[in-house]
Amino acid sequence: MPELPEVEVCRRGLEPELAGQVIQGVVIRAPKLRHEIPPALATLLPGCRVVAVRRRGKYLLLDCERRGVQGTLIIHLGMSGNLRFVPFDLPPAKHDHFELVLAGQILRFADPRRFGVVLWQPGPPASAECHPLLATQGIEPLSEMFTAEWLYEAIARRSGPIKPTLMDSHLVVGIGNIYASESLFRAGISPLRAANRVSRARYEILVPAIRETLSDAIAAGGSSIRDYVHSDGGAGCFQIQAGVYDRANQPCLRCGGVVRQIRQAGRSTYYCTGCQH
């Protein structure tokens, strides 16, 4: 599933070509995704100008305006979705479900597994935060509010393992499986350690590790593990730089210990038995 870095890379790829554009038309081929695409978008969006392309957690937010009427198109890429700019003469593929017709090109949304979201929130940009999908989202890990002190206090009463706790989007948004494993590796913290058994001093190490991991992933274009591609069709390469992710039974790049793979909350976790405690 595309996580914060992949969605941020997507946002940065879309913004230069999309912001300021007037939507010429909308095509809805298969409305039944995780939530049904509102059919009203076909008449609501044409003529709207995209005034900003934002991100909240793993959601893309396209703020639109037409003659003083405002609203936000909320997009989630789901498990396998992607947004690509394509020429008018490129025929749609089997899993191309939704598109915005622009001046000179099309922004096309493909989603083979149909877990994505394309929804509309009327009102000014700030009202998007009131949408049920966004209202319960946690703190942004790249924001100034995300500090060691905040995380220590927020997790003080949580006794579950630290790795699944970091992946709770109601607490912190966008730290997906690969980035939780990599952040804990960089901080030298075992993913098995109870969240409330991590000391305040170690949170002072963990928070910068999370920030650095996410920032490095964004700089690398994200991680293309399965279906994820950029808006221009290119792939991310952070997975090549990973210290522990997908390196089960290989020597640790830091200490030479063995990288182990286990299951936590139904997801694969990778960590070094030698230098993560």
Swiss-Prot record:
CDD domains, per database record: EcFpg-like_N
Enzyme Commission (EC) number: 3.2.2.23, 4.2.99.18
Keywords (A to Z) from UniProt: DNA damage, DNA repair, DNA-binding, Glycosidase, Hydrolase, Lyase, Metal-binding, Multifunctional enzyme, Zinc, Zinc-finger
Highest taxon listed in the record's lineage: Bacteria
Cofactor binding comment, as recorded: Binds 1 zinc ion per subunit.
UniProt catalytic activity: Hydrolysis of DNA containing ring-opened 7-methylguanine residues, releasing 2,6-diamino-4-hydroxy-5-(N-methyl)formamidopyrimidine; 2'-deoxyribonucleotide-(2'-deoxyribose 5'-phosphate)-2'-deoxyribonucleotide-DNA = a 3'-end 2'-deoxyribonucleotide-(2,3-dehydro-2,3-deoxyribose 5'-phosphate)-DNA + a 5'-end 5'-phospho-2'-deoxyribonucleoside-DNA + H(+)
Cofactor(s) needed: Zn(2+)
Active site: residue positions: 2 (schiff-base intermediate with dna), 3 (proton donor), 58 (proton donor), 267 (proton donor)
GO molecular function: 8-oxo-7,8-dihydroguanine DNA N-glycosylase activity; class I DNA-(apurinic or apyrimidinic site) endonuclease activity; damaged DNA binding; zinc ion binding
The keyword DNA damage appears for this protein: yes
Single biological process term from Gene Ontology: base-excision repair
One Pfam entry name: H2TH
SMART domains noted in UniProt: Fapy_DNA_glyco, H2TH
Residue numbers binding DNA: 95, 113, 158
Zinc finger (FPG-type): 243-277
PANTHER family per the UniProt record, alphabetical: FORMAMIDOPYRIMIDINE-DNA GLYCOSYLASE (PTHR22993:SF9)
Described function: Involved in base excision repair of DNA damaged by oxidation or by mutagenic agents. Acts as a DNA glycosylase that recognizes and removes damaged bases. Has a preference for oxidized purines, such as 7,8-dihydro-8-oxoguanine (8-oxoG). Has AP (apurinic/apyrimidinic) lyase activity and introduces nicks in the DNA strand. Cleaves the DNA backbone by beta-delta elimination to generate a single-strand break at the site of the removed base with both 3'- and 5'-phosphates.
Subunit description: Monomer.
Family: Belongs to the FPG family.
Protein name (Swiss-Prot/TrEMBL): Formamidopyrimidine-DNA glycosylase
Lineage: Bacteria, Pseudomonadati, Pseudomonadota, Betaproteobacteria, Rhodocyclales
